[in-house]
Regions:
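Short, well-ordered beta-strand segments
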Residues: 23-26, 67, 100
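Beta->alpha turn/N-cap motifs
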Residues: 1, 9, 29-31, 51-52, ...
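Ligand-binding clefts/hinges and TM-proximal coupling segments of bilobed small-molecule sensing domains
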Residues: 31-48, 85-88, 116-143
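Flexible hinge/capping segments at coil-to-helix
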Residues: 7-24
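A ligand-binding cleft/hinge motif common to bilobed small-molecule-binding domains
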Residues: 35-38, 53, 60-61, 65-93
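Conserved functional loop/turn residues at catalytic and ligand-binding sites
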Residues: 23, 63, 132, 136
Length: 143
């Protein structure tokens, strides 16, 4: 999972400096809000919305030029409307997914590790990541 800057393919954006003069939509108080507020130039107009649904709606209705959100939220837009011109411009913050297992639960730990290894060796683990997270897996640690 990651938070990113998304916009139409016609906008040339590769870094926070490229947001100069643009209207940027973000969910107020979110991690994305904190990151983009710190990184964006002072003349970028950051518009904060009350929740993700309002933020996504603001982008699709043209209220903002640029969307800052999680990759799964952005993927939901293009899934709902495959004709929507929306591409990732850059990653704001990478947020790897982890699983916690109660200390001492060796059976579950072994099961999870074997499942991951089986899917990785079978070539299916990256496909699962693509399906649910919309991105390739990062390099995995050795088991």
């Amino acid at each position: 999972f990651y938070s990113g800057v998304f916009a139409p393919s016609t906008l040339d954006i590769g870094s926070p400096n490229d947001l100069s003069g643009m209207t940027v939509g973000v969910t107020g108080g979110s991690l994305e809000d904190l990151e983009i507020t710190e990184a964006a130039p002072s003349d970028a107009k950051i518009v904060r919305f009350g929740d993700n649904a309002a933020t996504l709606s603001a982008f699709t209705s043209g209220q903002v030029q640029v969307l800052v959100t999680g990759n799964t939220a952005a993927a939901s837009l293009t899934e709902a409307d495959p004709k929507l011109d929306l591409e990732r411009k850059y990653i704001v913050k990478d947020s790897p997914c982890f699983i916690g297992i109660k200390k001492g639960n060796e059976d579950l730990l072994r099961w999870v590790n074997v499942f991951i290894l089986h899917k990785k060796l079978g070539g299916n683990l990256n496909a699962i990541s693509q399906k649910w997270l919309g991105q390739d897996l990062p390099p995995l640690p050795s088991l």
